Amino acid sequence: MSSQAFPAEEDHHNEERQTKKKRKTKHRHKFSEELLQELKEIFGENGYPDFTTRKTLANKFDCPVNVINNWFQNNRARLPPEERQRIFLTWKKHDFPVQACPFLSLQETQAAASNYATEQSFSCAKRALMRRPGCSLLEKQRIACQQMGYNCFSLENQETPSQQVGSMCSSLEKQGIPSQQVGSQCSYLVAGTEKHPGYALEYGGDTGSEHSTAYRFLSYNSAECLHPPPSSVPYFHGERTETRESQHASPFLLDYAQGAYGVKKDHCLCSFCLSLLQEQQQNDWQYHPQQHQQPQNYSEGMMLQEQLPMDSGPWDLEKQWPSAQSQLQSQLPQNNGKPLCSQLQHVPPQIAANSPLLPLGQDMQVGASSNSGLKCSSFRLRGLHGPATGTQGCSFAKYC
């Protein structure tokens, strides 16, 4: 009985061994002699192939990529340490071109590191200078040529062109006409008046009104880069539709800012009086539709304004102000030696009563013109809150 039990147990163990052998195992890939020879040649050239090379070899030999990886890894492991060090240095030089010897003393290593850092910082400065908008094409070519022939060991003896390039680039920002430099002091108040001289003042009434007019001032050669061009708004005059610019700042602020920005008061007075003269003459012409001819004072005032130089600065107008003032006084026969603001107070009441102009922020009562005198509120600036009754003086009497 026992003898029969042993063969049964042995058969059971044999079956277990056979089942273990039948399990799926990773078969070792065998290359042919030709493929092995080709792999050895590639391994001799580069023991650390990149992924593209390994993928190409896997497609060529019709095998997975991990088989190529294992073959190269096994061949590198079988090499002696000296050969493995040589192959590693070859691969390092191929990917990272290092021309220095790996065995250097401490002083040589510090000198090489300082020279490398200086060369890198100099090249970064070159690239930053070439990206500046003021550098011309010839300057960029000169910088590129100097960068190619640069020697890091003679950096201290060479004169770097960064100062020359920086001075040339900064000179572009400092260039300008002297009149533009003078006119730029008040360019923040009258924006864009070089091309659009007449939008500084407007009446307080509706822009759609037929009698809405704009004061005209002398042009300032202001810097265009400081302020954007004024936005255009539709302007209705009768049946025609024109386009005029919206006002950005009041010229009366010039008198307020004369101490901080050096603007002459006489220059402001000259431009303001010219605008008052022209506005009064335009009112006399517009309030009488039956007269289609321009008054003589209006044409004479325009001739006087054309005689003044349009591009003169505040200091030039200061010299010309006495002669211009005498001509202004002579152009008005009804002034009798009185200032312009006193003339505005003696405007006929029917003109102020029939005028449809309304000041901003105030309501005009019906019949107020019959009970009170002349109101200067219709002649005030937009946004300037001054007295509106006739008992008090005109709001711009202090500017005349």
Curated annotation (Swiss-Prot):
It is found in: Nucleus. Residues 9-18 have a biased composition (Basic and acidic residues). Residues 24-83 bind DNA. CDD domains: homeodomain (cd00086). The keyword Repeat does not apply. InterPro entries: Engrailed_Homeobox_TFs (IPR050720), HD (IPR001356), Homeodomain-like_sf (IPR009057). Residues 1-29 are annotated as: Disordered. One of its GO terms (cellular component) is nucleus. It holds the Pfam family Homeodomain. It comes from the Eukaryota. The keyword Lipoprotein does not apply. PANTHER family: CYTOPLASMIC POLYADENYLATED HOMEOBOX-LIKE PROTEIN 2, HOMEOBOX PROTEIN ENGRAILED. This is Cytoplasmic polyadenylated homeobox-like protein 2. It comes from Homo sapiens (Human). The gene is CPHXL2.
